[in-house]
Amino acid sequence: MERRGFRILGMLALAVFLTVGCEKQPEPEPEPPTPPEKKELTPTSGDLAPTDVPDYDKIHMNSEFYKSSREGNVTGTFYDPLKSSSLYYFGRSRQSEHFIIFWDKDYGTTYPDDAASPYHLDTKAFLDWCEEIYKYYVNTLKFIHLNTGEKSYLDQYKFQVFLWHDTTWAAYGSGPEDNITGCLWVNPEAANSRATVAHEIGHSFQYQVACDLILNKKATDIWQTAFRYDQGNGSDFWEQTAQWMAYQMVPEETFTNYNFGEFCDNAHRHFAHEDMRYGSYFFHYYWVDKYGLDAVSRVWHTALKPKDSIESYMSTFSLTLDEFNAQVYDYAARVATWDFEQIKAEGARHAGAVSWKGVDAGAGWWKVDPSKAPEATGFNLIRLSVRPGQELTMDFAGMPNAPGYNKSGDAKQAGWTLGFVSLGEDLSTRKYSESTIATAATNNYGTAQWTVPADAKYVWAVVACTPTVYITHLWDENNANDRHWPYQVKFTADGEVLDLGAPSSGGLNGGGAGSNFSWTLSGTTISVDVDIDTDEAVRQGQFILGYFDLPVAKVNAFLGTDVRKLDENSFYGVNADGSKIPEFTSYKPGMWVDINEKPCTWDKGTAFWQWYIWGGKKDKSGSVITYDGDQGGTGANQGRFVVGINPGNVAAAKGKTLVFRNKILAHGAEYDLVITYRYH
């Protein structure tokens, strides 16, 4: 590296020293030496000698070199990577400090760097990213124990990447059959996705943990380790952990990937449920807040058959079941606002995203809907409309083995933990109540009380499922045998019963903040007024979203018909002058309008968008399909209205008031649905 700049700085420092006096000037920090770049082999058709290959002794000759085709079986024939005829050949490779990438022989003499799309890959940038991942997973997360007195195969060998000349998506991180070093198999499309690479290398590290446990005689074989030991038909812990590891590297995707919605729709299920194995990565954030950034890797290093991930976690940190159950509740309460150190700032903008459904049981009581009945380690979050200073009470009655739900099993094992959480208008102030426990010993009853904090803008009730024994969940792809622990609740504020069937609103990707609304039913008109704070709105894809829910039962009573049975021809938009808008410009029934309330298409200067669902959900074409119980918290009891703003028009939206005028045709009569949106 050129050092002329340092000579000049040194002369200036000397001049200052002679002018000012004897005060010693600090020496500049020496820059670390730049490691020499590894020799890059030019693609060639000739055979090579080991001396032609940089770090030849760091490349383990694993079972991949006993294959004649990409997805073929391991054979008894060794296809020497020194020979150009082999599937993988050192003449078609590139190395960095801890990785080597081979591209298969279908690339011929063309570097992936020079190949046209879809076979193109910048191998230098790819290896740089791999090295960045390696450094974080080793030095910070401590998945591999180097220079600690323990042995690791990574002391001797490099990770290997095998790039397939293929357009079919391929991304597989793990290892070959010999249990020595982790590998990654990818096609160019997958290799160009930073999050995918971080996720799959996470699997490679999980495999490496297993290999090193065997090397250090802490496991007898790989089937004893968390990498191979299944809970039923698979192990959710693989995917949960790989997702969390990936979002350590690409934190901007923590809340924007579709797996976030998967978790929000399934948080009532067991932590280890297969339906959310790609989305259930938030407990990991709780672990590292409690025990440090290496907490997750510590669990992986101690997770051995027959313990599942939770049992291993409890064992690693010497937790009793009561202590663990207290953590489950604390974790659930924090999920309401995503109050975890690494993600809390952005998380508050997604507050309340976890969905809940209730069924009116009469006399102010609401039963949890079977589609949201909690399982062990699962939880529910219930948004409440209350004011600061009110005395809030939750009366709770557990209903183990109640009809209409999956069987709970032994009712003596029943347990729930209850409480409240609030978020301030500043989206940073969180307050938590004390928790209350209901078990078979209390006849499954419990009461939680709280004075709503003066700074509370949004409030949720928390119901965490905390049985008195730990219940393992087996991956069997059969939700019918999942053990439900149903309950019913009644809420009062200053002694007045809260109506959970009243409208609810949200603006932060399915939940708590960013919008407020009111509504009235009068004559033949449903009037809704919505206030949206564009500064608090959340981007979801290309849109900034808000929503509100209207209770179907009350709308049905007003219309005299079941609105859920009306088809799209029963709805149409109306211009300000009362004329009919001839067709929908968005999902049916839905409308794009410009800043002047004129209907338009999404690409014609669009600023605003609205569509709505009555007890159903939309497929990608916009058609109404049967409600399946898990669409953003709405369904048989709610009609959801979603409003979007094109992000390019947010500035134009501020200060504007737009009115969406709609007609509903029901049993031969016309009703008006007028929704006024105020953006500020």
Predicted regions and their residues:
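Solvent-exposed, low-complexity, repeat-rich "mucin-like" stalks and linkers
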Residues: 381-384, 512-613, 670
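Active-site-proximal alpha-helical
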Residues: 262-329, 333-337
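A short beta-strand micro-motif common to beta-rich folds, especially ectodomain repeats
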Residues: 543, 654-666
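Beta/coil-rich, acidic/histidine-enriched accessory regions frequently appended to metallopeptidases
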Residues: 307-520, 524
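Zinc-dependent metallopeptidase catalytic helix centered on the HExxH motif
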Residues: 179-254, 258-261
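Acidic/polar, low-complexity intrinsically disordered N-terminal segments immediately downstream
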Residues: 25-77, 81-83, 510-564
